[in-house]
Swiss-Prot record:
Record organism: Salmonella newport (strain SL254)
Keywords: Oxidoreductase, tRNA processing
Gene Ontology terms describing biological process: tRNA modification
Sequence similarity: Belongs to the TrhO family.
UniProt region (Disordered), positions on chain: 319-350
Protein name from the UniProt record: tRNA uridine(34) hydroxylase
Record's catalysed reaction(s): uridine(34) in tRNA + AH2 + O2 = 5-hydroxyuridine(34) in tRNA + A + H2O
Keyword match Oxidoreductase: yes
Domain Rhodanese: 146-240
Amino acid sequence: MPVLHNRISNDELKAKMLAESEPRTTISFYKYFTIASPQQTRDALYQVFTALDVFGRVYLAYEGINAQISVPQSKVETFRQQLYTFDPALDGLRLNIALEDDGKSFWVLRMKVRDRIVADGIDDPSFDASNVGDYLKAADVNEMLDDPDAVFIDMRNHYEYEVGHFENALEIPADTFREQLPKAVEMLREHADKKIVMYCTGGIRCEKASAWMKHNGFNKVWHIEGGIIEYARRARAQGLPVRFIGKNFVFDERMGERISDEVIAHCHQCGAPCDSHTNCKNDGCHLLFIQCPQCASKFNGCCSEQCCEELALPEEEQRRRRAGRENGNKIFNKSRGRLNSKLSIPDPAE
């Protein structure tokens, strides 16, 4: 029988990836389309991806597919062709190629079936997810940014917005996409007569959000084709000014792609200009936060003196303290209190 799940330890896989000599290309893509049998599709696609040495994170649901992966450079075109011929709905699918890439974004292939490819919390049976807003290409985005009648809405989470966003874009303060959707409707009521432009990292969240806004009575709704990644790529290729400021947070080991030279965030410990996310080195914490090199040295990669002290304890004592603890895996959020329960590297489907 074919192998449909990874059977090698994470440590072994990571060491193997780091020892690879061939460069890898980090790619993200998504597609909203009907999948009649997500589990069957998942198993078939897993075999295709495994044969091409693809690593990464892939979600499938009845509503489509959402993927962030890395592919050996010599196999990118083969991957593209096999993906396009796997299902007619995937033929010609746009692949977002990473803007900054060291090829070390993933080291294992995880492919899961979920209820939704993005957790939206929508349970309204009358909602039509296909009734989306109009696409905007790079040149159109820059025109809209200069339009006083347009309002840009960032459909990413607070830790993403903190390190980079479009000029004057509104933040919808929330920890998850499902929390953002009702807040966006509420916050934008006063802008109902404006042109609403929504964006996210690669397009998947803002596409669904645009449909949700239209469902709630907003008529002038656009979203950026391919999200921040494709916008920056096209703007650079066409010699256009790149109007995104700062860094684009990404959901893999890189944790960010530099878009502009500006550093708009600050170290969460000392306040110095910094936009580098990290996870607290204390395995009982793993807080996602921004830390400058000086504080990383001072606190040994930890988020606090308490975690620094705990990290210095014997491993057995650290394990004892971690046992049954419920306050690990958190994200720093200045807008809603210091700690909020989450994954170390947040789940892009949330």
